[in-house]
A protein has these predicted regions:
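Predominantly soluble domains enriched in secretory-pathway, periplasmic, or organellar proteins
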Residues: 1-260
Length: 260
């Protein structure tokens, strides 16, 4: 008899196999580093958005050992799919000179910056074929060559204002992206390259009459009468999701919402 947790999980072509369908994080424990990072320096890379720099910290001494210039408004430092490069996402907020700066983790030094439109954040397709650049200002996901960052195709996400952070389904077929500025989550089909839907993070997600009364971000929330349920009130606080993570078995996603 074969136990359910011993049956291989069907994933998208090219994606590494899931070692344990009951715990997708099983291979991320202590002393389970990939051979690809064997020669990488043990460092912490911190983007300094206002200074347009990255500071490098030695965790053994807790001292800054280097600081170097990158592009305008660095937001995140993201390891590549093969773990051999770190990419700094410089989105140049409100400008047109966004870029990506590679860092060699073996030397801790930056390489040549590549011009890329509005890279607020970065992910990778589960098969490692594409870099997924989160173009927040344009409500768009740009799929690019993992080395040259040449644009290959885009997926528009018009209902996802402030698209930023994401996590993937355990089989690699879809991803959920948070929509920070309109309190929502967007589901993207990575196989067919389409948006499957967007849902508001609100107790009133299935009530358009109530959602229409929710305050826009930046507005002071208040309690107002519920138009659909006399005697009840609605808090107009909008959601502001920051991140999303899958449960170990991949059956549930947890959203970190700083407002609701």
């Amino acid at each position: 008899t074969v136990r359910a947790d011993e049956v291989p999980l069907a994933t998208v072509p090219g994606m590494p196999p899931v070692a344990d369908p009951a715990n997708l994080y099983r291979e991320t424990g202590a002393n389970q580093f990939s051979p690809a990072v064997a020669h990488a320096l043990e460092r912490v890379y911190v983007p300094n958005r206002a200074a347009n720099t990255v500071s490098v910290i030695d965790p053994a001494t807790l001292k800054v050992v280097d600081t170097f210039k990158v592009g305008v408004n660095p937001q995140h430092v993201v390891p590549s799919w093969d773990l051999r490069t770190l990419w700094v996402a410089n989105n140049a907020e409100g400008r047109s000179d966004g870029s990506l700066t590679p860092i060699d983790p073996v030397t801790g030094k930056p390489g040549k910056t590549i011009a890329v439109e509005d890279p607020y954040n970065m992910y990778w397709s589960p098969d490692g074929r594409y870099a997924i650049v989160v173009a927040e200002a344009y409500k768009r996901l740009d799929f690019r060559d993992v080395n040259t960052m040449e644009l290959k195709f885009s997926i528009q996400t018009p209902a996802c204002a402030g698209i930023n952070h994401a996590d993937f389904s355990i089989d690699g077929r879809f991803a959920l992206f948070t929509c920070e500025f309109n309190g929502a989550i967007t589901k993207v089909d990575l196989v067919n390259r389409v948006v499957l839907g967007t849902i508001k993070l609100s107790p009133y997600f299935n009530r358009p009459d109530a959602l229409a009364l929710i305050a826009t971000p930046g507005k002071k929330p208040r309690m107002i009468p519920d138009p659909g349920q006399p005697g009840n009130e609605i808090c107009t606080t909008p959601g502001m999701p920051q991140d999303v993570r899958a449960s170990p078995d991949g059956k549930t996603f947890f959203v970190a919402d700083m407002m609701v």
